[in-house]
UniProtKB/Swiss-Prot annotation:
Keyword Cytoplasm: yes
This protein's encoding gene: purM
GO cellular component, one term: cytosol
Pathway: Purine metabolism; IMP biosynthesis via de novo pathway; 5-amino-1-(5-phospho-D-ribosyl)imidazole from N(2)-formyl-N(1)-(5-phospho-D-ribosyl)glycinamide: step 2/2
Domain of life: Bacteria
Organism of provenance: Prochlorococcus marinus (strain SARG / CCMP1375 / SS120)
Keyword flag Nucleus: no
Record-listed E.C. numbers: 6.3.3.1
UniProt protein name: Phosphoribosylformylglycinamidine cyclo-ligase
InterPro entries: PurM-like_C_dom (IPR010918), PurM-like_C_sf (IPR036676), PurM-like_N (IPR016188), PurM-like_N_sf (IPR036921), PurM_cligase (IPR004733)
GO molecular function: ATP binding; phosphoribosylamine-glycine ligase activity; phosphoribosylformylglycinamidine cyclo-ligase activity
Similarity field: Belongs to the AIR synthase family.
Amino acid sequence: MDYKSAGVNVEAGRAFVNRIKASVESTSRPEVIGGIGGFGGFMRLPRGLEKPVLVSGTDGVGTKLELAQDYGSHYGVGIDLVAMCVNDVITSGAEPLFFLDYIATGKLTPEALTEVIEGIAEGCNQSKCSLLGGETAEMPGFYSDGRYDLAGFCVAVVEENKIINGSKIKVGDQIIGIKSNGFHSNGFSLIRKVVKLAGVNEKSCFGSRKVPLIDYLLKPTQLYVHLVQALLQANLPVKGMAHITGGGLPENLPRCLPDGLAASIDRNNWEEPSIYKWLRNEGDIPESDLWNTFNFGIGFCLVVSPDQSKDLIDMCSANGFVAWNIGQVEEQPKQMQSRIVGLPT
């Protein structure tokens, strides 16, 4: 008996590394030192920073991976992995520097995993961060053959005196919601149940344009890094930012607010994506569960002074993003434990 007969093909692993080399190298920033294959990745800090602070974030794609693998869609989840990490770290005003990935699988499937890496590289290129390294672990008996899990890790940098942490937010500030492009990478344990209950297959369509439902569900998570960097480079005084992921607006928006303040949301200020009507009807899901699970059409939020809200919305539009004024900051009602007002709890 040898390692290969036990289920681990070292030669296939080496071939896979060579296969993805071009995709990885396409993401390289000028600060990167050396190439892939070493025990660690090396990168200089960008020039001109006086008091640089590193910001780190890690995340996965969750059970969206199960649906993606069922339908042979691998490229998009690579973008998802980057977006889930990058969208988190940019809420501090930081610039993404590098990304690391971890892939665990029962049996190495080069075609599928190459698509994943190509998606990760695309996400990194959109974010202007380097795919500095990664690990692919073949774990027979732990994962089923052909199934895989993903984890990502991102490091960004920000000047210490430019960190955005919500500390300047005050009563009356406006909350700007940026449109999401779908479910992103949250709530898929519930979505998969509804998909099964509704008998969804490859031919199932959604909406007036008859978009394949699976394509809509698996649409890669929107990256907001280009927009945020454009806003900051224009010196728009953004006071706080929130990436709307698992837990929806009720859980994520308060994370950027100082103690004692709450977000008052007007649900009529943006159009609810029609997919939620389908989800409601097919899954018989309570309204509060929907709001506390999904982004409901808002993928990212920014908090600004009232006199800056129009300029911010206009700049979002100029950069290809739809934005709405969805509410304002208020004092947290003493009798309420929740720090969000106007949404089902």
